[in-house]
Design a protein with these regions (language model features):
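An active-site-proximal structural segment forming one wall of the substrate-binding cleft
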Residues: 239-243, 248-253, 299, 342-376, ...
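Active-site-adjacent "subsite" loops/lids of carbohydrate-active enzymes
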Residues: 221-238, 295-298, 309-361
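Beta-loop motif signature
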Residues: 40-86, 119-158, 197
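Aromatic-lined carbohydrate-binding/catalytic grooves of carbohydrate-active enzymes
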Residues: 253-288, 380-388, 548
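Catalytic domains of carbohydrate-active enzymes, especially glycoside hydrolases
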Residues: 243-268, 363-370, 452, 527-535
Length: 564
């Protein structure tokens, strides 16, 4: 994780008078004693090298008469000499200058930021110098002492602040801190905070008021262009040996992106070093070698497609098998099987670290353009356990479910953006409505953090209304859902792109409608008409080549003019 190297200015050598040879001593001519040094006898000046330290981003310097000569960016490397009167004399392009009193020189970049107090604006865990999570959570409003940084960017800003929180040391990203306590404890109000404040904890996922809505820095990543509309084909990892068949479909239709499993619950894409370290059981179940998986992804990229790597986050039976201590358990500490699966608890930071490390490794090994986190939630249908007191989520920090989910995504986005990739999150279709769900997903809070948000409003997952069956009305169902999703988009400061999963399989409910190209077209049009214009992803669990081939007319014509 490092930041940019410290900036430097050009340096010029000091002009030092030449010391003449010492006169020869003779018996008749004793050496002359000199009580005061002169220019001829003064030793050469010893300039030291250091870095400009100041609380500001720049430091001014002056000539002997106090006239301003210019400014230096914090962290600039200079040659300097500390004078007896306390002034700091430096060498610059223009010659000798003197730093203003609010700046000084230190021996290492890590110390260029003077100690001062800041306040936690957004609750986050401290990190180590490599960006890995520490157990200490810095709560909103807490005072920390900034004692330095890990590195500087070219403009003198810190990559991470080195901080002390009540004797516990670590690092924090600067944007999670405020200069005053009042600013730190205030809630960001984009005109809709009162809306969030009125949405309490209805179903056990937490309230909306204590989530974070501060604007996040998003936008194009240099060298990585996300298509404005991702028309995306889903490919299960175990089908990558058929990559040529999927390319044929994409090349002859409007598809311009692929989403490929890195992990999908019990289906593991490849056995990586990170997985071997954290989850050897999962690595042993891998369906591809690293080399074969990478070759398939590279083939998609070489053909000009935007490629997304999908990770199932908090649904991981293999990880629980290897680490039952990180599981959601019964009161006796035994991993609890929920909906047929074992779940690591989303409250645990080791679980977070594993998933983010796995994502970073996937970017480095495979060159994905984006990482998508699916199952980024708590298990659903746990109300009966919670009511009976027969479930333990091991909530070490006293967080709500929604806080844990949003904070995980904040950490993941911070890390992955520095690796040059986008971050997306999958959410249940229910998440588009105006409450915090029981499993901790709240659309405005998640959309504010990630680059793309992908709801899963499959028509056959909606309840029937009398004789009206949503899966028989794909346009109306997705249009109505899309309007709700866009309403949530307007409730957050920096909303994500809305890129939606669509049903690309036959309905699983009576009368078991066949979903052909007309039904796919209807879903896509319903979303677009509702304002959800970021694209779609096809959900077909088997990634059936035959099914996708039959749906090609819905994907539109191949765009030979679009730069993919």
């Amino acid at each position: 994780m490092g930041g940019c190297s410290s900036p430097a200015v050009s340096q010029q050598s000091s002009s030092v008078a030449t010391v003449p040879s010492k006169p020869e001593e003779t018996e008749t001519t004793p050496p002359t004693e000199t009580t005061q040094p002169t220019e001829a006898t003064e030793p050469p000046r010893q300039w030291e090298t250091g870095y400009v330290a100041t609380l500001n981003l720049t430091a001014e310097y002056y000539d002997e008469e106090g006239n301003p000569l210019g400014t230096l960016t914090r962290g600039t490397q200079v040659e300097y000499e500390k004078l007896p009167d306390g002034r700091m004399q430096i060498l610059t392009d223009g010659g000798i200058g003197y730093l203003r009193e609010d700046a000084y020189i230190v021996s290492q970049v890590a110390d260029v930021i003077p100690a001062h107090t800041r306040y936690v604006r957004t609750a986050v865990n401290l990190r180590d110098i490599d960006g890995n999570l520490l157990v200490t959570l810095a709560d909103k409003g807490a005072a920390v002492t900034v004692t330095g940084c890990d590195d500087l960017r070219e403009d003198g800003t810190a990559h991470m602040y080195r901080v002390d929180l009540g004797g516990r040391e670590g690092y924090m990203m600067p944007w999670y801190l405020a200069e005053s306590e009042a600013d730190a404890v205030a809630n960001y109000d984009s005109g809709s905070y009162a809306v969030h404040a009125g949405r309490g904890d209805r179903y056990g996922g937490g309230g909306a008021a204590n989530l974070d809505y501060y604007p996040r820095e998003k936008g194009p990543i240099a060298g990585n262009i996300m298509p404005e509309e991702c028309r995306t084909l889903y490919v299960a990892a175990w089908r990558l040996n058929e990559v040529d068949a999927y390319l044929k479909i994409a090349d002859n239709s409007g598809i311009n992106a692929f989403v490929v499993d890195i992990t999908d619950g019990g289906a593991v894409g490849y056995a990586s070093d990170v997985m071997n370290a954290y989850c050897p059981s999962g690595a042993a179940a891998a369906g591809n070698t690293v080399e074969d998986y990478r070759a398939a992804i590279q083939k998609l990229k070489d053909a000009g497609y935007y490629v997304i790597g999908r990770i199932t986050t908090f649904n991981d039976t293999y990880f629980v098998k290897d680490h039952p201590e990180y599981a959601i358990t019964d009161p006796e500490g035994n991993p609890l099987k929920l909906n047929g699966e074992y779940w690591p608890t989303p409250f645990n930071r080791t679980v977070w670290q594993y998933k983010v490390d796995l994502a970073v490794e996937a970017v480095e090994l495979m060159g994905f353009h984006e990482i998508q986190f699916d199952y980024v939630r708590f298990p659903d249908l746990t109300y009966k356990y919670e009511k009976a007191g027969t479930i333990d989520f091991h909530n070490a920090y006293g967080e709500t479910k929604a806080q844990a989910i949003q904070r995980f995504l904040m950490y993941a986005a911070d890390i992955l953006h520095e690796h040059g990739v986008y971050v997306s999150a999958d959410v249940f279709g229910e998440c588009a409505y105006n409450y915090v769900t029981a499993y901790g997903q709240y659309w405005p809070a998640i959309s504010n953090v990630v680059d793309a948000i992908s709801g899963m409003p499959y028509p056959d997952h909606f309840s029937a209304s009398g004789t009206w069956l949503p899966w028989e009305h794909p346009y109306d169902t997705l249009y109505s859902w899309g309007k709700s999703a866009m309403a949530r988009q307007g409730e957050t400061a920096t909303p994500a792109v809305v890129r939606t999963w669509i049903q690309a399989y036959n309905a699983i409910r009576d009368p078991y409608n066949t979903y052909g190209s007309d039904e796919i077209t209807a879903q896509i049009k319903g979303l677009q008409d509702a304002g959800c214009t970021g694209g779609f992803l096809t959900w077909n669990a088997a990634s059936s080549v035959d099914k996708y081939t039959s749906l090609m007319p819905a994907f539109g014509p191949a765009d030979t003019t679009e730069a993919q």
